[in-house]
């Protein structure tokens, strides 16, 4: 008898749901608003499925409906869908406003985190400058060699969550010891297609994408 392999995290469960109900759930692009009460339909549809439990389904749904892809799709006039992708009512205005507020809150947190990181870097760079201020000629030489771009030395980048990326988002792409700004063109499996500032388009893995 083959042993059932249980799914252990939300990402695996969401991928499983997208495989079982592709017209309802998606892993890329804008997500469709879900039917009110979909959890009950889902629990009944997977009642005999030993891979997932109701508790896991509830947690995975909570994560799915709170990511940026889903919140972007909750706009005025959007149509909810059931497990089969069939229309299940127009999104109510209060839910549109709630989604917009959640999205703004999430983006504000990211912006705040970036601001804190940016604010911390000049302080570190200033300490380095004071430490080396004894000899002007040596300072100039050091600035040319070691500190020509202190941000690259000091700045700490945070890996982005692919589930939160949208087309048009601006990220940083790491190439060796350097990073460059890029715009997301498409989120793909385990990475994203991006356009660099010089116009070059390429696909990069998730571990090279930073906020």
Swiss-Prot record:
Gene3D superfamilies: ProQ/FinO domain
Disulfide bridge map: none
Keywords: Chaperone, Cytoplasm, RNA-binding
Domain of life where this protein originates: Bacteria
Annotated compartments: Cytoplasm
InterPro entries: ProQ (IPR023529), ProQ/FinO (IPR016103), ProQ/FinO_sf (IPR036442), ProQ_C (IPR035236)
Primary localisation category: cytoplasm
One of the protein's GO biological processes: post-transcriptional regulation of gene expression
GO MF, one example: RNA strand annealing activity
The UniProt record lists the keyword Repeat: no
Region (Disordered): 112-148
Compositional bias segments (type: Basic residues): 124-134
A GO term from the CC aspect: cytosol
UniProt keyword Protein biosynthesis present: no
Protein family (similarity comment): Belongs to the ProQ family.
Function: RNA chaperone with significant RNA binding, RNA strand exchange and RNA duplexing activities.
NCBIfam families reported in the protein's UniProt record: PRK04950.1
The protein's name in its UniProt record: RNA chaperone ProQ
Organism of derivation: Histophilus somni (strain 2336) (Haemophilus somnus)
